Amino acid sequence: MSEAIKTDVLIIGAGPCGLFAVFELGLLDMKVHLVDILDKIGGQCAELYPEKPIYDIPGIPFVTGQGLTEALLEQIKPFNPNFHLNEMVESIEKIGDPGFRVTTDAGKVFECKIVVVSAGGGSFQPKRPPVPGIEAYENTSVFYAVRKMEQFRDREILIVGGGDSALDWTLNLHPLAKRITLLHRRDDFRAAPHSVEQMRKLVADGKMDLKIGQVTALEGADGQLSGAQVKGSDNAMSTVSCDTMLPFFGLTMKLGPVANWGLQLENNLVPVETASFETNVPGIFAIGDINTYPGKLKLILSGFHEGALMAQKAHRYVYPDKRLVFQYTTSSSSLQKKLGVN
């Protein structure tokens, strides 16, 4: 087990509600780390609708999901939060009163006084391609995310998909890989035009391969891939030599390991009391779309409100002997100093 990272608060989920919670906690002098299963900050806003307009953020008539994420990151910059992306929390163990030990699927361990679950509707899980026996190669030759690029140096990689993730990793891994083949079911891509243009230039220059078709079977033994059988658009069969496959077929929402954390659940949501949005486990809070209570509205602005009240209660756990004096950022010189505006 790796040495534990110690922090006041661990937030699970780096979407808008989790990001704004950093701001509210930071104003009250609490140190925060955030863990997210995605490879980017912003949650659903960044992953599902980065360019989609949002019209119901107070005081902002129009903003995109990406724009909101960038604004929140700028707002919390004074508090220097630490992000741990591409990691999923697997277990939460109570070790004090308050106090928790949290472990991720990457083997990282956190020790914190407070846990805030801000995981949207659960965790994003990669969609598995409908290829027989693919499970035998997962995490040895088949990967659904790139955590360390160096891991793929000198590999013969088959990247499957036609969206931004497939194109981005094709371009990013190209300098490291022995050879890259991009496979998509049609010669039409849903990625940024500039990325598609770069990819086609690499193909034209003979620096990578592009195939149109679908994987029907994998070849290899003992978890080590040696090739993939591909059915082309003309139904012709061929074999692509590869020792690594990266399928990017999008993500699906699942409750995931939240169900194993000892939290009360109601229709796959976490019930909370509305004074502080604490769960049935003292010291664990739930904000945003993951929680439920009478009158709940699944709106970003509701999650912001929940984060503000959560921080007030969290302060009592982190600083049990310190009296909390409520202050306004408009008039408090100490808060303005923390924000770097004084």
UniProtKB/Swiss-Prot annotation:
Cofactor descriptive note: Binds 1 FAD per subunit.
Annotated FAD binding sites: 17, 36, 44, 49, 89, 124, 289, 330
InterPro entries named in the record: FAD/NAD-bd_sf, FAD/NAD-binding_dom, Fd--NADP_Rdtase_type_2, Ferredoxin-NADP_redctase_2
Documented EC number(s): 1.18.1.2
Cofactor(s) essential for the protein: FAD
Entry keyword set: FAD, Flavoprotein, NADP, Oxidoreductase
Broad class of enzyme this protein falls into: oxidoreductase
Keyword set includes Flavoprotein: yes
Reactions this protein catalyses: 2 reduced [2Fe-2S]-[ferredoxin] + NADP(+) + H(+) = 2 oxidized [2Fe-2S]-[ferredoxin] + NADPH
GO molecular function: ferredoxin-NADP+ reductase activity; flavin adenine dinucleotide binding; NADP binding
Top-level lineage group: Bacteria
Complex formation: Homodimer.
Similarity field: Belongs to the ferredoxin--NADP reductase type 2 family.
Protein name (Swiss-Prot/TrEMBL): Ferredoxin--NADP reductase
Phylogenetic classification of the source organism: Bacteria, Pseudomonadati, Pseudomonadota, Alphaproteobacteria, Hyphomicrobiales
